[in-house]
Amino acid sequence: MVSQLVSGFSIFQNDTNMKTSWLAGLIFLSMLPIGAAAQDKGIDDFSKNESICYCMPNWSTPNNVVGFDNNWQLLRAMQVPRSKEELDSLGIPCTYSQLQLLRDWGLIERNEDDRYQTAILLLDSAATARLRAHSRRLSDELVGVIRPSVTDYVRLLERDGLGGHAYSLLFSLVTDGLTWKRLEADGRVRKMELTLKHPMWDGEFWTLYPKRDFYCGTNKSTLGEFSISLNWSEKAFQKMIPLFKNSYLVPRMFDDLSKSDRVSDAEVIAGLSPFGLVDGEGHPTIPVIREDTTDVIYAASWKMAGTIADFLASHMDTVALRKEFGFVDGSQSIVILYHEMLWDVLAQLEQAGLVKRPAVLADPEHARPEEFGKVIFLTRSEAEK
C-alpha cells in the first residue's frame, strides 16, 4: 500500500505484517551526478524529496537508511557509476562499511570494475512532472469509469452510518488495498516476499522531486484474524501520537471482538473511546469489515478494485513507460505510476464532492481526537470461525 511513508508509522509496536508506502524522499531518473538543474536546487536535501516504499519490511524500511549520515548524497552521486576513490576525489566522504550497508539494503550495486551505482530510482523535477502528467491523464479516464460505483459505495456507507469513513475506505481499502491484491493475483504486480536474497525488505522504493502538496498512505498491522489499517499523512501522524501511545490496547480490543460484537475490557474502552474507535459501551465506531464477499462493504470494495485493476491493465502502456523512465519491468511501471494516480483519483473525487477528506487529514492542527477514528478501520479474515 502506499501506499507512501515514514518508518515507524506502525500502530502495533510488534508489527510483523505491514504493506506500506512510505513518503519522505524520492527516487529515479536524473542521470546528472549531483547538481542538476536550477529548478532542482532543493533535491540534494533528502527531506525535500518524496520517498515512497511499496514494500514488505522486516524490521525497518529503506528510507531510514537513506536518511543516515550522507547516504542521500552518495546515492545522488552514484547515479553515475563511481569508485570509492572517485567519490573521495569529489569531496564526498564515505567508508567501506557505509557502502556495504547500502549494498546490503539493495540501494546500490557494485559493478565488475569495482564501481558503485545507485540501484533505486531517483526522479528529478523533469521526470516527476512527466510522470504526474501521465497520472493526471489516466486518472481523468479512471474517475469517469468508477464514478457511478463510487456514488453507490458512498451511499452504502451512509446507510450503515459510516459516511464519514468513505474517503479512507476508498483510499486504504479499495485503491491502496484490494486493487494491489487484484493486480498481484493477475500477475501484473510482483508479490513481495522476504527471502535470503531480500532479507531486509522486498518491493519497490523510489523518490520524486518535488513533494506533492498533499499525499497520504496506508499502514496495516495484523494480529491473528484481525487487521487494523490507518490512512495517514505525515502531519496527521504527528497529531495522532496520543492515540498511538495507547496502541498496546489494540490487541486486547481484537481479543474482545473475536468473542463478541463489542469490547468489554474497561481499560480498552477508556483508552480508545476518546479517539473515536469505540463508544462508551464498547461498540466499535469504526468499520469492522469481514474479508468475505458476504460482507456488503467488502463485496463492493472488491468489485471496484477489480474494475480499477482491469483499467490499469488495459490503459497503462508499460512498454512505453519503461522506455521513458527506465523502469525495470511492467510491475515496477504499474507500481510507480499507479501510486501517483492514487492521489490524483482521490483529489478528483473530492473536488467532485463525492467524498470529503477527514478532518485529521484536511486540517490536522485543528482536528479533534474523537475524529481520529475516521481514518482507521478493521478487517477480519475469513478464518474467523
Question: What is each stretch, according to the model?
Answer:
Residues 79-87, 247-263:
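Short capping segments at the starts of secondary-structure elements
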Residues 89-105, 110, 260-275:
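Short amphipathic alpha-helical interaction segments
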Residues 114-119, 282-289:
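Minor-groove-contacting beta-hairpin "wing" of winged helix-turn-helix DNA-binding domains
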Residues 36-38:
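Boundary at the C-terminal end of the N-terminal hydrophobic targeting segment
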Residues 132-231:
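Extended alpha-helical scaffolding regions
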Residues 24-33:
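Bacterial N-terminal signal peptides
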Residues 120-154, 290-322:
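Short, amphipathic alpha-helical interaction segments positioned at domain boundaries
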Residues 41-72, 208-249:
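Short alpha-helical segments that sit at the start of domains
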